A protein has these predicted regions:
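N-terminal acidic, proline/glycine-rich, low-complexity intrinsically disordered segments
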Residues: 1-17
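Short, Lys/Arg-rich, polar N-terminal cytosolic tail immediately upstream
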Residues: 8, 48-93
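Intrinsically disordered, low-complexity proline-rich tandem-repeat tracts
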Residues: 14-22, 26-68
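Generic low-complexity, intrinsically disordered sequence content enriched
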Residues: 36, 69-72, 81, 637, ...
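C-terminal His-loop and adjacent cap/lid subdomain of alpha/beta-hydrolase
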Residues: 88-453, 473-644
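Gly/Ala-rich beta-loop-alpha elbow adjacent to hydrolase catalytic centers
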Residues: 457-464
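Short glycine-enriched nucleophile-adjacent loop
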Residues: 464-475
Length: 644
């Protein structure tokens, strides 16, 4: 090989340090390759020389992970040996580590909340009810532990506490996961009972996380309150004797919490926000609802009430009135334009009156006179819910049954949702309906008996309560009307509560028989239920549509500590046999159930669907009305698309 074929080599530096510096670049290790064995030494001159030791390069990231893993394992082992912590200094004002007794009771309450209730609930509401009940359980457990420490001078030793904590951490997480998974099976069974698809989305980790987050939030708030109380007591202790400082500090703290919850959270928070949302909704109009062209409807031509003044539910009610042509097409016989009168919560100034709801009642009678309502075959007074809602199924069923020869009148007392109205002004429901009934009956009394329309009353949910509160007793209801159709009355409704309490022996509370069904009957599946008992059913008649699974019917503060009668055997037809009563827990389950009671199909939950057809057919059947007519109208009402 000639010298021209050789690869040019860089000149070698005579300084060994220069070589070292040149080889110290980032790719120095990559150029080494495999060990060539003995070779020229590092210094000048030929001859083999020893190669220096190669130091292996260890990656930094795996080393860090190993160190962290060892540290975590050490802490886990340390925690396993002593799975709790005491306050590092007795001067700490608030306990830092949870109390074992309280945590155990919180866990038991959470497990209890996983049991099924009246209607299926989604996973996120299960997490909410689990967190609320766990917080209640923690509060009770903490109170019991404090009482025990106060009464018993000797405390368990460290070894016993360690074993108890170890048992808790070993059992509680696994049991919670298994019970959450088992609750999904129970929810699917309940869905099948209530004619829903068995498919269900049930996020076990999210349920646990939501419950833990709510429990942690409640615990944080409680400890902040306690810290404030202890700090206040210590400050007062510098000025007052110790007992007086304790009493004064506790009283001031309780007062501050009460004022904060009542004024800030409840009044300015929940109620104020709900009022603003409801007021904005009340000013709108549902898509598809238009101003009526019939002079027989409030808000129409010649009405004493402007269309814009009726409110959201008033416009829904009057703007969806069926026409004479539609009623004729359905019945095949000549029909009339039905009368619908609706008076909003704020009547025109010209009808102002100092008496509660007297102005609205007077205006309603004026509208009834204007539309010729007292010349119709049936006049129905409808109690409204908190928002002013009237069930369209109830109204249209009566109008189709009588081919429009009807008049329906309602007065709005609030635009708030029913649950807010119940909390704020429940009494207004009864006052408004009573004022309307008094005014209507006074006008009817002025007519000859043979020219009076049949007077019936109806209402659903808080509207049913409004009707019942107007009469007070079942005897007054029977004496003052020609019949009543009431659906889903809340537990605090006076008449239905009396009927369930004084029911005939042997009849269940969810389907009570009263006075052998002489005038009043209850039903969930009215086509069959209203035929029982077999004794004669005399007029006037009262029909209650009451679903066994309706949480609105059964919710009561008594659920906190008392086992309800509706959980006694036999259970209702759509109640799962796996339902149980637990103190405090069942109350919150039923409270949450009310929020989803419209998520099922009729006749389950708080949905009554076309049951109004059977109800009206039993209470005030038109002359010549047959069972076939009821079946046909039930199918129509049940399958048509409601206007609102």
């Amino acid at each position: 090989m000639t010298s021209a074929d050789r690869t040019p080599q860089p000149a070698r530096s005579p300084d060994p340090g220069a070589d070292a510096g040149a080889d110290a670049g980032p790719d120095a290790d990559a150029d080494l390759g495999p060990d060539p064995g003995p070779g020229p030494g590092p210094g000048p001159g030929p001859g083999p020389g020893p190669r220096g030791p190669v130091v292996p390069v260890v990656p930094v990231v795996p080393v860090v992970l190993v160190v962290l893993a060892r540290r975590a394992a050490g802490r886990c082992l340390s925690f396993a040996r002593r799975p709790y912590r005491d306050r590092p200094d007795p001067a700490y004002r608030v306990r830092r580590w949870p109390d074992l007794t309280a945590l155990c009771l919180a866990t038991v309450f959470f497990w209890s909340s996983l049991s099924p209730s009246l209607v299926p609930r989604p996973w996120y509401l299960q997490g909410i009810v689990g967190g609320i009940t766990a917080a209640i359980g923690y509060a009770l457990g903490s109170t019991l532990a404090w009482l025990f420490r106060t009464v018993v001078p000797r405390h368990p030793g460290e070894g016993f506490r360690t074993r108890c904590w170890q048992a808790y951490w070993l059992l509680a997480p696994f049991a919670s996961v298994w019970l959450i998974s088992e609750s999904a099976r129970m929810q699917r069974r309940l869905r099948v009972l209530q004619d829903l698809p068995p498919s269900l989305t049930w996020h076990t980790p999210m349920i646990a996380l939501i419950a833990l987050a709510l429990l942690a939030l409640a615990l944080l708030l409680a400890r902040l309150v306690r810290l404030g109380a202890v700090t206040l007591i210590r400050l007062l202790g510098r000025l007052l004797p110790r007992p007086v400082a304790y009493a004064t500090g506790a009283l001031l703290t309780a007062l501050a919490v009460l004022v904060g919850v009542r004024d800030l959270v409840y009044d300015r928070g929940i109620v104020d926000v709900a009022d603003r949302i409801a007021a904005a909704t009340n000013g709108g109009t549902k898509a598809g609802i238009e101003r009526p062209v019939s002079r027989f409807v409030s808000g129409g031509p010649g009405s004493l009430l402007g269309w814009d003044s009726l409110g959201y539910e008033g416009r829904n009610f009057t703007g969806s009135t069926p026409t004479r042509a539609a009623l004729t097409a359905w019945s095949g016989r000549p029909s009339r334009d039905p009368v619908r009168v609706y008076v909003p919560s704020t009547p025109p100034v010209a009808f102002a009156d100092d008496r509660p709801f007297a102005a609205q009642a007077a205006l309603a009678v004026r509208e009834l006179d204007r539309t010729g309502a007292f010349d119709r075959a049936v006049l129905a007074v409808a109690g409204t819910t908190g928002t002013g809602w009237v069930d369209p199924n109830v109204a249209e069923a009566l109008e189709h049954m009588y081919r429009g020869d009807t008049a329906i009148v309602a007065v709005q007392y609030s635009y708030l949702p029913s649950w807010v109205s119940f909390l704020v002004d429940k009494e207004k429901a009864g006052q408004a309906t009573r004022a309307l009934l008094d005014a209507v009956r006074a006008r009817l009394d002025a007519l000859p008996e043979d020219r009076r329309p049949r007077l019936v009353v109806t209402g659903e949910s808080l509207g049913a309560y409004a009707v019942e509160a107007s009469f007070g007793t079942v005897d007054a209801l029977l004496a003052g009307t020609d019949g009543a159709l009431l659906m889903g009355p809340p537990d605090f409704s006076p008449i239905s509560r009396e009927l369930r309490r004084d029911r005939d022996p042997g009849s269940p509370v969810w389907r009570p028989a009263y006075d052998d069904g002489a005038h009043v009957r209850f039903g969930q599946f009215p086509a069959a239920d209203l035929a029982r008992p077999t004794a004669a059913w005399r007029h006037p008649r009262v029909v209650y549509l009451q679903n066994a699974s309706d949480p609105v019917v059964w919710w009561s503060p008594d659920l906190l500590l008392d086992r309800p009668a509706w959980l006694s055997r036999p259970l209702g037809p759509d109640i799962t046999p796996e339902i149980r009563w637990f103190p405090f827990v069942t109350f919150w389950q039923t409270s949450v159930d009310m929020a989803v009671s419209y998520g099922v199909d009729a006749p389950h939950g708080h949905r009554y669907g076309a049951g109004a057809v059977d109800g009206w057919a039993a209470v005030v059947p038109p002359e010549g009305w047959t069972e076939a007519d009821t079946t046909r109208l039930r199918a129509y009402i049940g399958h048509r698309r409601a206007a609102y």
